């Protein structure tokens, strides 16, 4: 019989199990490692059982598992920033026990920056996985003084963006909609505020971020390029506390505390911006007339009902309002809520049930002249799933489950405003269901070999009511070739697709500090964003697979070599990847995508490929840390002419909108003293592809008509930028209130990075190119942060 005892001090002996119980060959000790002050789980803590070679590292909720025979041991637990914990164990049977760590107390003066001796990059089975803790993100120089998940993510190998003000991020050259973004299980369709300058994730509530860009576990699906899984931390179940910050552009606040001490907690956070005063001081008249505002609210509650049952709920709401001069206004909002129930059965089975629902709405207002109007589109979803985790033996793990998404899309509604002459128009709602079953196996074959193999089967159905247009066979789809239509009733299946998605990863350890990893995964995408702009905008519509539009499919391959030096103080890797895409969606030249009742006439089907090399180097030495990553990648597309569609670029391969061959990030951090630090980040990338006029002809000596190049044959200027930050604090560490002050400078050397290029031509003169720089100047900021 297992016996769970209360926490003991380090000087006492901890007796686990019953001394008169039936002896077993192998005993199991499970539990969690927590912060003694606030009860927060500590992921990444290292447990070592002396005098054996038994080790474990806590997972995201602080859980661990150690297997040992009956005996007397010394358990050592260590984690960066905490006092090392040692306690003597007398183990007689299976047991469950939680251990508490205390923050490390350091006198003012020089401090050495060290990483926990973590060889997870070498020993983990998955390739192409990046984990970002909030501590790592806080070490980077910040835009307007605030830690930001998406900006930190863009310092990772293989991750780029279209430029300043871009909505989302691109992984290995993929589109922004090809990333599955989850926040505590909630689907996120637009992850940014202020048209891309801030992410919607409240930084003081984030526990950690994991990006899967190569090896993707079978429990994830629905996107071609990557999975971004953002986990929010649980509230303090020991005492009431709070933290926040006040900056020149936004402020934030988090409050947390126990609902029932040691059993249930809450945490709530809010952010709001006030950047209008900055716009009022701009040189541009249009900018002085502009307005920008956003807010977000996030709440989370967790409770342990019993030793084996836990429930939780997360909810968030965001709103953005941006008006450019007296011409156009954007509004977009997200609201979502998620519930989970976890049940431990015995010591080897963990069951989880989840349910969440959400909505994303965007509005575009034309506020100029006699054509004032409001364009609206909306996405609603309902999502649920069950999964089970089973570990029959120490070296084998099995996870299986099922989930379903139900989508309702309102692709567009146009309404006149203030008595304008705009003609109302509305597109009918679209509905679809996506049902998946998955099986995930992970097996430690030997000390040198670990294998992960999984399979995911997904079925998609597009549902009525819907009127499907039928086109003349053997010719391209146009409005002129419509011949008939089919009418489907409410809930009737209009189209269905399904497919198997195998997942495979292999790790072979070469030495104690090096390994080789192989990875393969297939993914289907049944829900895609329709946008032919340089960067997705809040009003771009999302399109379900249907009678005419097939799901996209990607096969991802990767191989990596991982090598650490000096007991993991230096970490390096080299990864090669290749992606093959089928049924890729592209667009005709000058395609009309908004309020199009037959959007399939503007779409083209092709194939794509992406390939590249990622190089990473990280070194901690003394008070300094240096990180470098470089990516070489190409992302190409091909749309060939056929009897049913036109081609692009004569059927040749051409660069995608996000093809940026070279990307380099350099990050430096200096812990000057315990209460002061300096950081600097430099980023460089090749300019995005663009299409440009190469010649022109004059009609009637009056009208000059430009002739454009093939698609994406030119590039805008290269992007590069240097940011720095200096932080003083925290001070008041011995008191209840702790403070810090950060001075940051974004774009230190005033680089006018081009977001896009446009062309103008005066009569009888050559074409002139002009760059559009969203942030073409230096941006200093000061931020006051506090904790209590």
Language-model-detected regions and their locations in the chain:
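C-terminal beta-signal and adjacent terminal beta-strands/loops
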Residues: 524, 581-582, 675, 684-702, ...
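Face-selective signature of the C-terminal outer-membrane beta-barrel domain
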Residues: 302-319, 331-478, 570-578, 612, ...
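Short, acidic Ser/Thr/Gly-rich low-complexity loop/linker segments typical of extracellular
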Residues: 52-63
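Gram-negative outer-membrane beta-barrel transporters
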Residues: 577-580, 599-694, 785
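Periplasmic N-terminal accessory/gating domains of Gram-negative outer-membrane beta-barrel systems
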Residues: 83, 95, 117-177, 182-216, ...
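Outer membrane beta-barrel strand-and-loop segments of large Gram-negative receptors
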Residues: 381-385, 426, 430, 434-436, ...
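Surface-exposed extracellular loop regions of Gram-negative outer-membrane beta-barrel proteins
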Residues: 361-362, 408-419, 461-484, 508, ...
């Amino acid at each position: 019989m297992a016996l769970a005892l209360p926490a003991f001090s380090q000087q006492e002996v901890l007796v686990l199990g019953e001394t008169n119980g039936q002896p077993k060959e192998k005993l199991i000790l499970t539990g969690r490692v927590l912060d003694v002050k606030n009860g927060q789980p500590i992921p990444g803590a290292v447990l070592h059982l002396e005098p054996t070679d038994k080790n474990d590292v806590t997972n995201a909720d602080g859980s661990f598992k150690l297997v040992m025979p009956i005996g007397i041991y010394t358990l050592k637990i260590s984690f960066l920033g905490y006092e090392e914990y040692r306690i003597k164990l007398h183990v007689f049977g299976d047991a469950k026990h939680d251990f508490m760590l205390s923050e490390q107390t350091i006198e003012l003066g020089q401090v050495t920056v060290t990483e926990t001796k973590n060889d997870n990059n070498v020993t983990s089975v998955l390739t192409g996985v990046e984990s970002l803790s909030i501590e790592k993100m806080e070490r980077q120089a910040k835009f307007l003084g605030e830690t930001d998940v998406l900006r930190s993510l863009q310092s990772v190998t293989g991750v780029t963006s279209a430029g300043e003000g871009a909505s989302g991020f691109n992984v290995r050259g993929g589109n922004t909609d090809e990333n599955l973004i989850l926040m505590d299980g909630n689907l996120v369709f637009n992850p940014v505020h202020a048209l891309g300058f801030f992410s919607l994730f409240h930084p003081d509530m984030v526990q950690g971020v994991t990006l899967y860009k190569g090896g993707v576990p079978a429990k994830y699906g629905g996107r071609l390029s990557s999975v971004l899984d953002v986990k929010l931390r649980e509230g303090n179940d020991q005492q009431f506390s709070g933290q926040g910050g006040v900056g020149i552009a936004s402020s934030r606040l988090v409050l947390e505390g126990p609902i029932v001490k040691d059993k249930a907690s809450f945490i709530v956070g809010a952010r709001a911006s006030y950047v209008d005063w900055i716009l009022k001081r701009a040189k541009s008249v249009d900018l002085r007339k502009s307005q920008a505002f956003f807010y977000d609210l996030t709440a989370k509650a967790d409770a342990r009902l019993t030793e084996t049952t836990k429930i939780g709920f997360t909810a968030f709401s965001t709103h953005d309002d941006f008006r450019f001069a007296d011409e156009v206004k954007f509004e977009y909002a997200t609201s979502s809520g998620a519930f989970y129930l976890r049940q431990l059965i015995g010591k080897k089975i963990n069951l989880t049930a989840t349910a969440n629902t959400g909505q994303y709405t965007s509005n575009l207002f034309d506020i100029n002249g006699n054509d004032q109007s409001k364009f609206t589109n909306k996405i609603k979803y309902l999502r649920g799933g069950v999964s089970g985790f089973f570990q029959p033996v120490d070296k084998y793990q099995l996870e299986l489950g099922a989930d379903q998404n139900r989508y309702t899309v309102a692709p567009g509604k146009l309404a006149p405003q203030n008595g304008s002459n705009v003609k109302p128009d509305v597109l009918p709602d679209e509905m679809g269901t996506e049902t998946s079953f998955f099986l995930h196996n992970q097996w430690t074959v030997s000390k040198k070999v670990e294998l992960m193999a999984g399979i995911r089967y997904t079925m998609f159905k597009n549902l009525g009511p819907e009127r499907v247009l039928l086109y003349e066979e053997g010719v391209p789809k146009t409005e002129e070739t419509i011949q008939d239509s089919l009418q489907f009733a409410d809930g009737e299946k209009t189209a269905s697709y399904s497919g198997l998605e195998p997942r495979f990863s292999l790790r072979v350890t070469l030495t104690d500090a090096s390994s080789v990893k192989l990875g393969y995964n297939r993914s289907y995408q049944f829900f895609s964003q329709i946008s032919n702009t340089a960067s997705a905008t809040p009003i771009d519509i999302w399109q379900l697979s249907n009678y005419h539009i097939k799901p996209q499919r990607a096969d991802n391959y990767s191989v990596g070599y991982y090598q650490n030096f000096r007991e993991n103080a230096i970490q390096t890797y080299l990864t090669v990847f290749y992606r093959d895409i089928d049924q890729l969606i592209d667009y005709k030249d000058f395609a009309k995508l908004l309020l199009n009742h037959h959007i399939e006439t503007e779409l083209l089907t092709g194939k794509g490929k992406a390939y590249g090399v990622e190089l990473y180097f990280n070194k901690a030495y003394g008070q300094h840390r240096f990180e470098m990553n470089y990516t070489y990648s190409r992302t190409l597309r091909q749309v060939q002419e056929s009897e049913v569609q036109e081609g692009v670029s004569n059927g040749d391969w051409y660069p995608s909108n996000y093809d940026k061959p070279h990307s380099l990030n350099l990050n430096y951090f200096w812990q000057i003293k315990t209460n002061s630090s300096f950081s600097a980040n430099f980023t460089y990338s090749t300019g995005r592809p663009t299409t440009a006029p190469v010649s022109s002809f004059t009609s009637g000596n009056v009208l000059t008509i430009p002739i454009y190049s093939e698609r994406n044959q030119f590039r805008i200027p290269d992007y590069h930028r240097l940011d720095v930050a200096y932080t003083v604090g925290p001070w008041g560490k011995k008191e209840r209130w702790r403070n810090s002050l950060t001075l940051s400078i974004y774009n230190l050397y005033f680089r006018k990075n081009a977001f896009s290029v446009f062309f103008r031509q005066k009569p009888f003169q050559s074409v002139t190119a002009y760059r559009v720089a969203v942030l073409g100047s230096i941006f200093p900021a000061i931020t006051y942060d506090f904790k209590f």
